[in-house]
Structures are given as structure tokens and as C-alpha cells.
A protein has these predicted regions:
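A generic structural motif
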Residues: 100-103, 126-131, 331-341
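Acidic, His- and aromatic-enriched active-site or binding-groove loops in soluble protein domains
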Residues: 3-12, 117-148, 239, 243
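Internal hydrophobic scaffold segments of catalytic domains
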Residues: 113-116, 125-128, 153-158
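Positively charged, Gly/Ser-enriched RNA/tRNA-binding surfaces
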Residues: 10-12, 21-34, 40-96, 108, ...
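Glycine-rich, mobile lid/loop segments that gate access to catalytic sites or pores
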Residues: 101-112, 118
């Protein structure tokens, strides 16, 4: 969304800060695909920038850890592998299996419904974003209904324009959002595109059944991901516990890892569709939760400068530094030829 992007001018240059890590990956793959393996796996950890309201675990500059599989892949296998990666990573972070849920769906399911309802193309983005708000704090079915119709007024009085759907169109979407069971969904939605999405989801679950992480993965047809480049499988991971904000109030933190499949993203740079699927951990948000669970101890540890009082003892000074570094303490020996203790302490300060 352009409103969420930090953009400005530097003289005659248009500057935009990095919004995510998926678009740069798509450009890199499009430019270098001849030199890359047919199945390209990549991870990237880097800061991104969002021009949106900050809050607990939500920042305007934050770190993402992305994992992607691009190329000639079996989509179900790639998506199942990423679900396993989410589960094993969170377990390695100290989270128990009942402390998080990996919600999955398929964008084709809701797109088929939108096509059946003959919702115009200019309204579809607003519809998708409205559905994506269902599980967000302060929304629920009533909030989504308002966004599907004329407008929604939040607690602060701010008004968001809705998709301006008819009552019948809005009612059909709200009925869809109440369905929880994959079998019932298959019986309800007859659109071929929706059926295709349901089958793709069943294929992922079949593969997940071969491993030990099936219990954490649940269908949730209300997740659609607000970014337009996701076109089939989508995943969103939420914590099953609340955290305490800086005002002492318990809150839901939101998604800590999300992603999906994006065959058409690379085509923007290369001109042909290339299968790709990926996930992104919100590192800052995850750390916020882990610190509250005492899985990570935050230490205010200061670096150490070993002062040089006599050069004949340099060997001893470096031995001290080695011992400090072995205990994960940042340390260094004073390097200047000026041996005045006051000058050395000035550097330390």
C-alpha cells in the first residue's frame, strides 16, 4: 500500500525506504535466474520501514527474517516445509506447542467468492483488506461489515471509507467468514477457483500429516493477507497468549510470522510467472513476546576496555580480553601509543 511506504525527494531523486524483503528478492531472482539453481532457497535478515501507527511490538522501523523457496517447486511441498520451519523455529525459541497457532488458507478461496459476487475490480482490494481485519483487535464481524459497506468509525472517531458493497454481497461474505470447517467450505463454495484453492490446501495438510507439526497448523479462511502479490497459499502465525504493554495492560500482540505464495510477484520484473513461496518473522515483535516469557534475559552489559599500563604486559592484557570475549563480553585492548591513563579512560567513556 503506497500510504504505508516512506517516500521522499532528495533533490531531483525519488527515494523510497525498503518496505519489505519480498520485492527485492523478486527483482534479484528476475535479474539472476540464469545463474541460480532451479530451486532457489534463500533467507535474509534486514530492517524494513512502514509509515504506520507505532505500538507495542509494532514499529516504523523493524527487523524481518525472511525465508523463501523460488523456482521449479512442488507448491504443496514448499508450503508444508515452511509451516514446519515456523513450528521448529518457534520451538527453538522456547515456545511450547500450545502457545502458538499457524493459521493457513488459500487466497483462491475468497477470490472465487468475490468473482461469484461480481464485485468490481476497484472494490476488491478494500474487500480483501476488510476481511483481513476480522481477527485484529477492535474489529470482529461488525467491524468487517462496516468496512464492507459504507464506512467504519473507530474508537477515536476516525472514519475509514468502506467498499460500498450491497447488503446481499456483504451478507454472503460475512456468512463465508463464519465457516470453520474445510469440508463444509468445500460443500458451500462451488466456484472452480475456490475449489482449486481448497484442493491445494488439502494437499498441504496431507504432507503435514507425515510430520509432527500438524497440531499447530489450523485452517482459518478469514486470513487473506493485505498485500496484493499473494495469490494462493497464505499463512499467519499468532501467539495464544497475551502480553503486557508499557501501560501495564494485557494486549494481543498480533501476527509474529506471516507469508504465502506469490507466483505473479516475479512476473512484474521478468514477464513470466515463477512459483515462489515465503514467510517473514517479525523479529522485534517475537523478541517482545519472548522477553515477557523470560525466554530471553535482557542484560545491560557494558563493553570493557583493557588499559595498557606497561607494554611488557601486553600478552597478559590480550589474555584478559580473550577470557572476556569467551564469556560473551565485548572487550578490547587500548591500541594507541599514548599510555596516559586519563586518555585511556576518556576513550572508555
Amino acid at each position: 500500500p503506497m500510504s504505508d511506504v516512506f517516500s521522499f525527494k532528495d533533490g531531483d531523486k525519488n527515494i523510497t525506504l525498503r518496505y519489505d524483503l519480498s520485492s527485492p528478492l523478486a527483482r534479484f531472482y528476475a535479474q539472476n535466474n540464469q545463474e541460480l539453481p532451479s530451486i532457489f532457497k534463500r533467507y535474509q535478515i534486514q530492517n524494513v520501514f512502514r509509515n504506520e501507527k507505532a505500538g507495542n511490538g509494532r514499529y516504523r522501523e523493524f527487523m524481518q527474517a525472511d525465508f523463501d523457496i523460488v523456482g521449479n517447486v512442488n507448491p504443496a511441498q514448499a508450503n508444508a516445509e515452511l509451516c514446519n520451519l515456523i513450528s521448529s523455529t518457534l520451538a527453538d525459541c522456547g515456545l511450547k506447542k500450545d502457545q502458538f497457532t499457524i493459521n493457513v488458507s488459500n487466497r483462491k478461496i475468497v477470490q472465487g467468492l468475490i468473482d461469484d459476487l461480481k464485485i468490481s475490480e476497484e472494490k476488491q482490494t478494500k474487500v480483501i483488506r476488510a476481511i483481513d481485519k476480522l481477527d485484529k483487535p477492535g474489529f470482529g464481524l461488525k467491524g468487517v461489515e462496516d468496512l464492507l459497506k459504507k464506512e467504519r468509525k473507530d474508537q477515536s472517531g476516525a472514519i475509514t471509507k468502506g467498499a460500498d458493497l450491497s447488503n446481499e454481497q456483504a451478507a454472503q461474505i460475512l456468512n463465508f467468514l463464519k465457516i470453520k470447517d474445510l469440508k463444509k467450505l468445500k460443500e458451500t463454495l462451488k466456484n472452480p477457483l475456490s475449489q482449486e484453492g481448497i484442493q491445494e490446501l488439502e494437499n498441504v495438510f496431507q504432507l503435514l500429516g507425515y510430520g509432527s507439526n500438524l497440531n499447530q497448523v489450523k485452517t482459518n479462511f478469514t486470513i487473506v493477507r493485505g498485500l496484493s502479490y499473494y495469490d494462493s497459499f497464505i499463512v499467519e502465525t499468532n501467539l495464544n497468549f497475551k502480553v503486557t504493554n508499557n501501560k501495564g495492560k494485557e494486549i494481543e500482540l498480533g501476527s509474529i510470522c506471516s507469508g504465502g505464495s506469490y507466483a505473479k510477484l516475479i512476473s512484474r520484473f521478468r514477464g513470466v510467472d515463477v512459483p515462489g513461496t515465503g514467510i517473514s518473522f517479525g523479529v522485534d515483535r517475537l523478541l517482545f513476546a519472548l522477553i515477557q516469557l523470560n525466554q530471553i534475559q535482557v542484560q545491560d552489559q557494558k563493553p570493557v576496555l583493557v588499559c595498557v599500563m606497561d607494554e611488557k604486559y601486553l600478552k597478559n592484557y590480550y589474555e584478559i580480553v580473550d577470557q572476556l570475549r569467551d564469556n560473551n563480553i565485548n572487550a578490547e585492548v587500548f591500541l594507541s601509543t599514548k599510555k596516559n591513563l586519563g586518555k585511556q579512560l576518556d576513550l572508555a567513556n
